[in-house]
Structures are given as C-alpha cells and as structure tokens.
Amino acid sequence: MGTDSRAAGALLARASTLHLQTGNLLNWGRLRKKCPSTHSEELRDCIQKTLNEWSSQISPDLIREFPDVLECTVSHAVEKINPDEREEMKVSAKLFIVGSNSSSSTRNAVDMACSVLGVAQLDSVIIASPPVEDGVNLSLEHLQPYWEELQNLVQSKKIVAIGTSDLDKTQLEQLYQWAQVKPNSNQVNLASCCVMPPDLTAFAKQFDIQLLTHNDPKELLSEASFQEALQESIPDIRAHEWVPLWLLRYSVIVKSRGIIKSKGYILQAKRKGS
C-alpha cells in the first residue's frame, strides 16, 4: 500500500481535477463486503474502495505523464449499456451540487454519465437542491442557473425529463411558472414529512408533476467527509486541497421487470488554486 499511496499522492499533487467513478456497484463482488446502513456510508465506502483499487493499479506510464485530469475508476466494474438493449432500459440520475457555484457542473455531470454508460441521453435527471448558506432559504434565484442548464440539455436531447428534490409547494410553483421546460417530478424526503403536504399534492396533481419519495440526507457528501475519505485511502496527500464539485448517482433499470441492472456514482473534484 505504501508504494501505491506514494504514486497516487504524487499524481494528485500535480493534477488539478479528479474524476472518480465507481463503475457498476453490482459488479464489485469482493470489494463489497458489508451492507452500509445509510447512503452517506455507502458513498464514503465507495469513494475509499475506488481510490484504493485505482491506486493499486497505477501504471508507470501514468506516473511519467502526470496528467492534469486524473480518471480514477474500478476498471473491472465499468459496464456500458449494450446499444441493442438501450430501449429496454431506463437510465435515471440524481445530481448533487457540492462545492460548485458553476452551472456548467450540470453539463459536465450529464456528459460524463452518458460517456460512462455509453448512451446518447439520460431518461431522467433529478437535481438535489443546491447548497445555500446557513439561515438562507432556497429561492428560485438559487435554482435558476442549474435549471437553465438542464433545460438546454433537454433541448439538445441529452436528457428526456428533469425533476427537482425537496421543493415545497411555493418553491415548486415558482419554478414551474418561470421554467420553459417544466419539472415532471419532485422528490420529497419522508424523514421530514410522513405524509405528503396537501397543498403540494394538489399542485402536483393539477400540473401532472409526479411526487416521489427519497431518503437521502440533506448533505450526502460534504467537503470534510470527502477529504477524510481521500486522506484515509491515500495518506501521502494534502487532502485539504481537494474540493468535491458535484456528485451524480445513476441507476439503470430494466423497464419490463423493474429490476436494477446497474448503479453507481460519479464525482468531480478540483484542487484548490489549480
């Protein structure tokens, strides 16, 4: 592990961007020993194991090149969708903005997901509410730059349908009235409300917006938890220099049977000052 960690640390010290993708978690086999109790635990476990697996397979060529963008993945778990089976699959994603205030993160995440899965478009993308400062309520202004980019992606046929997460009736109504491409779904966290709010239910029914449930924490990946996972996997690194920009979780479901064929995480991180 020592030599692996030193090589990985040297690469990360020179790179400016890290692209981490887990591949299909259902293909992990021996890497997946325990069943995590929360989404945050699963994610942290995935980040660490992906980093460990990647650092154990660093080639001498990579060390000589010192690439600016590092592609970190579990190679044996990568699984593209067979083009002949694409029509039978529903490809969904949820995008979490972590440390980025750039709407281009949305396009980067969708482009990378399409590339990883070998598809031309995603069937649905839900955006988690972007982070806001403590004491500040999420407003339409916070959502607009990300939604504009999602609309562009729908218009360029990169995404079929787009949705929101954790918007109350007022927020959803404001977005709906402003948006060119309307949200077709809104996720509600059942931990915060055991029963769907009646005003939200009525509005969603009126405008044909699907209300879904989720159990993601308010902050699935924090800067601190990412840096801790990085430090534990690769001790020879200045982990505090790295900031996660966004995280995308995807799933591929066989439409006719409702079973999950593939699921995984993709994230992008930047080194501060690079």
Swiss-Prot record:
Record protein name field: Glutamate--cysteine ligase regulatory subunit
Keyword Hydrolase applies: no
Claim: Heme is one of the keywords in the record: no
Cross-referenced Pfam families: Aldo_ket_red
UniProt pathway: Sulfur metabolism; glutathione biosynthesis; glutathione from L-cysteine and L-glutamate: step 1/2
GO CC annotation terms, alphabetical: glutamate-cysteine ligase complex
Annotated gene: GCLM
Organism from which the protein derives: Bos taurus
Family the entry assigns: Belongs to the aldo/keto reductase family. Glutamate--cysteine ligase light chain subfamily.
Chain positions found as Phosphoserine: 59
